[in-house]
């Protein structure tokens, strides 16, 4: 399956530089990519308001139903690879109910691909 992840700065550049190797998605409801992405899937990555310019292969995934201590454990164990230190709203994020962790492999820049607007969604599943 193919997916598009929409990232803000500085996270987009962190993926390109290799500093960010895990994409995390935190939500109140079970929304994509929670339980919708798997190892081997192709992930296209775009910066907010711009075309897709990066693709990656999904190396690993983990899904969590959260509580406060589990969110803190994720922060401690994977925070550096996620780039949690760049988040301005960790207290709000740590109160979410679900977390998807997606390990990125074979990250490469590609020719720009225009995609339709996401209507505020940060994740799109391609059919």
Q: Where do the PLM segments sit?
A:
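Residues in well-ordered beta-strands of folded domains
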Residues: 6-8, 25, 59, 103-105
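A structural signal for short, well-ordered beta-strand segments and their strand-loop junctions
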Residues: 6, 44-45, 53, 103
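Short beta-strand-centered aromatic/proline hotspots
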Residues: 52-61
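Short coil-to-beta transition motif at edge beta-strands of beta-rich domains
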Residues: 34-44
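Contiguous surface segments at macromolecular interaction interfaces
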Residues: 26-34, 50, 64-127
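Extreme N-terminal starter segment of soluble prokaryotic enzymes
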Residues: 1-3
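A generic structural signal for residues embedded in beta-strands
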Residues: 23, 45-46
């Amino acid at each position: 399956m193919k997916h598009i992840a929409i990232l803000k700065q500085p996270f987009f550049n962190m993926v390109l530089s290799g500093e960010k190797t895990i994409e995390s998605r935190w939500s109140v409801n079970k929304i994509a990519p929670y339980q919708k992405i798997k190892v081997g899937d192709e992930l296209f990555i775009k910066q907010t308001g711009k075309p897709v310019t990066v693709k990656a292969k999904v190396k690993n995934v983990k899904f969590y139903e959260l509580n406060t201590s589990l969110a803190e454990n994720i922060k401690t164990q994977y925070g550096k690879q996620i780039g949690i230190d760049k988040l301005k709203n960790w207290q709000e994020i740590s109160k979410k109910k679900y977390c998807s962790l997606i390990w990125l492999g074979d990250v490469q820049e590609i020719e720009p691909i225009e995609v339709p607007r996401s209507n505020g969604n940060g994740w799109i599943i391609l059919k």
